[in-house]
From Swiss-Prot:
Protein family according to the UniProt entry: Belongs to the RRF family.
HAMAP family with a match to the protein in the record: RRF
Name of the protein described by the UniProt record: Ribosome-recycling factor
InterPro entries noted in UniProt: Ribosome_recyc_fac, Ribosome_recyc_fac_dom, RRF_sf
Cellular compartments annotated: Cytoplasm
GO cellular component, as recorded: cytosol
Main location: cytoplasm
Length: 185
């Protein structure tokens, strides 16, 4: 029973870390990356289709992305989708390809992004602590129902606390890495 609680807790904390990592990986650092366009969808044959399924996204250099479109008829749709996204990008048509220059970040914009990232990190830490609280409550219920002993309760809560510390450190490492990446340019 306690092992199931530990496993579920670890899975939930891992999902929280993954969500945090995905959220901040979409934040522009002034460097070209195909992941920047992973949330772009176009209307293709009546359904929303991810950009990466209808094209190849290539890093030309550190400040330029190139999109090789598989079907020339949707090039303008892709350009329009990128313009309508909130990424502040200005795609340029070049033959059947789309070139996207990635603007350099200003110092002010970097500081704003760092504040946003730190806010996301704090929200993720809070989620981790809430997951810990839920797990500890389940363990206390098991003790109350006399399914486990007090020793088992203390051992389990210690494991949960160690897990919590581990995942909060992971959040801090991801945050630190992203901050360095933002301040690099």
């Amino acid at each position: 029973m306690i092992n199931q609680i530990d496993i579920k807790t670890r899975e939930r904390m891992e999902a929280c870390i993954q969500t945090f990592h995905n959220n901040i990986s979409n934040i522009k650092t002034g460097r070209a990356s195909p992941t920047l366009l992973h949330n772009i969808y176009i209307e293709y044959f009546g359904s929303k289709t991810p950009l990466r399924q209808v094209s190849n996204i290539i890093v030309e250099d550190s400040h330029t992305l190139k999109i090789n479109v598989f079907d020339d008829s949707i090039t303008s749709l892709i350009r329009k989708s990128i313009l309508n996204s909130n990424l502040d990008l200005n795609p340029v048509l070049q033959g059947k390809d789309i070139i996207i220059p990635i603007p350099r970040l200003t110092e002010e914009r970097r500081k704003q992004l760092i504040k946003v990232i730190r806010g996301d990190a704090e929200s993720s830490r809070i989620q981790i602590r809430n997951i810990r609280r839920d797990a500890n409550d389940k363990v206390k219920r098991l003790l109350k129902d006399k399914i486990i002993s007090e020793d088992n309760e203390h051992t389990s809560q210690s494991k949960i606390q160690i897990m919590t510390n581990e995942y909060i450190k992971k959040i801090d490492c991801i945050l630190e890495k992203k901050e360095k990446e933002l301040m690099k340019f």
